[in-house]
């Protein structure tokens, strides 16, 4: 090993250790949440704040804590980085087992190497992606008789899944593929057909691609994240990214439905208003309390700021050159979910049979922070809706993902409502699918 390499490695280690050992700050404030958040002033530093919860999966009988009136149980353990969930009409549960794909041009230099160390510390990228969808068939509805089948394999970092008629669509990191499905199938043996290409490439900074169908089954909507933290790779690298695509199923044509959304991940329809809601993971390195992640009803043709501004028209001067005309167009989102919470999973309560106050609203899977001194997220929350709009502050549904030492025993991501009306939670550090149901004893 050369002297320069040794010096670089030593500097890298020092930066990482200094960053992850920073002291505590005030806890996340209520002002970071809700329809009218109070935004803190931006803070910048040479070394970004890194306070990463070390991945240490659940041991023994340990499990998350469910809210009063509910209980948590195991649907399946021993999965390989389960990220996303989809429930078929017959009640079968599909789990996308997926992790970061190779991205040779992403996160280069010392900063990039630190980011990769952070990801591994947090439990991502420690092994090749499983690249498969697993089917869970819960025969008794209690998780005591669960069959497990490899439903579809040979994929490429899959996340989004949706069934339209007898066609099953999967959003890989670089394309949507489709296969035929028959009710009751436990394994798809035919080779998936490529339906439409998605932005991938050697940077592919935000690699997950989420997917939902329109209620009439004529359109697909795809969440495509940005190719950077805050535009540092140039605006050309963001072409058709930081956006929700609309795809016409019949023709295969697509358009950008809404953009300026840094990393739109969860997608869910709000039936009362008919609006498509999205959960958005916002940018880093502007301070512990800025900017908040959010969920919003996306409007056709709307622009939400990225990379020029955040939370409406708050200018991010790191983006050069700036574009005042685009900033002027930027609209503020509907509901703040807290800074650096990594609010990824999104699920409408639908036919949920959980007790009040978890009846009419959105469930949000908060994967957890790495870029603030006091950790935020690492929980599933519920936001009540009234007349199609979110009201009040989030309510914790499932917590306890951090142990007493601050290690991450699990990290919640994808969410779904099962056929029994319980909430399913994918935990990609605990390698478990959890079920939150009403507690009959309360």
Stretch-by-stretch model annotation:
Residues 25-67, 102-130, 206-208, 226-232, ...:
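Beta-propeller domain segments
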Residues 90, 98-100, 173-175, 181, ...:
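Short loop/turn segments immediately following the C-termini of beta-strands
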Residues 416-442:
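Blade-level signature of beta-propeller repeat domains, shared across WD40, Kelch, NHL, RCC1
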């Amino acid at each position: 090993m050369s002297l320069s390499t040794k010096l670089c490695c030593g500097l890298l280690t020092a930066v990482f250790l200094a960053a992850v050992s920073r002291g505590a700050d005030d806890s996340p404030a209520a002002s970071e949440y809700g329809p009218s958040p109070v935004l803190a002033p931006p803070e910048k530093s040479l070394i970004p704040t890194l306070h990463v919860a070390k991945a240490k999966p659940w041991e023994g009988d340990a499990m998350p804590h469910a809210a009063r009136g509910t209980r948590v149980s195991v649907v399946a353990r021993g999965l390989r980085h389960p990220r996303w969930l989809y429930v078929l009409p017959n009640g079968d549960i599909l789990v996308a087992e997926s992790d970061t794909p190779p991205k040779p041009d992403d996160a280069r230099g010392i900063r990039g190497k630190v980011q990769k160390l952070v990801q591994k510390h947090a439990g991502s990228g420690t092994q090749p992606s499983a690249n498969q969808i697993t089917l869970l068939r819960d025969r008794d509805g209690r998780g005591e008789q669960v069959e497990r089948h490899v439903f579809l394999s040979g994929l490429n970092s899959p996340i989004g899944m949706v069934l339209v008629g007898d066609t099953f669509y999967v959003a890989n990191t670089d394309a949507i593929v489709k296969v035929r499905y028959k009710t009751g199938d436990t394994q798809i043996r035919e080779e998936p057909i490529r339906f439409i290409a998605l932005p991938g490439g050697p940077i592919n900074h935000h690699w997950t691609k989420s997917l939902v169908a329109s209620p009439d089954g004529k359109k697909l909507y795809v969440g495509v994240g940005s190719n950077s933290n805050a535009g540092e790779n140039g605006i050309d690298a963001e072409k058709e990214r930081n956006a929700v695509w609309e795809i016409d199923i019949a023709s295969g044509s697509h358009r950008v439905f809404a953009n300026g959304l840094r990393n739109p991940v969860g997608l869910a329809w709000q039936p009362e208003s008919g609006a498509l809601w999205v959960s958005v993971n916002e940018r880093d390195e502007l301070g512990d309390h800025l900017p908040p992640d959010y969920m919003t009803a996306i409007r056709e043709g709307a622009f939400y700021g990225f990379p020029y501004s955040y939370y409406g028209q708050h200018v991010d001067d790191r983006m050069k050159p700036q574009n005042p005309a685009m900033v002027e167009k930027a609209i503020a989102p509907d509901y703040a979910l807290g800074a650096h919470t990594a609010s990824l999973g999104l699920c409408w309560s639908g036919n949920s049979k959980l007790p009040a106050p978890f009846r009419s609203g959105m469930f949000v899977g908060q994967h957890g922070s790495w870029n603030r001194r006091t950790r935020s997220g690492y929980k599933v929350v519920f936001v009540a809706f009234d007349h199609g709009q979110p009201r009040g502050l989030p309510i914790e549904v499932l917590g306890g993902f951090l142990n007493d030492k601050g290690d991450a025993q699990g990290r919640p991501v994808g969410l779904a409502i099962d056929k029994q009306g319980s909430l399913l939670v994918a935990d990609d550090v605990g390698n478990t699918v959890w079920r939150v149901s009403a507690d009959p004893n309360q």
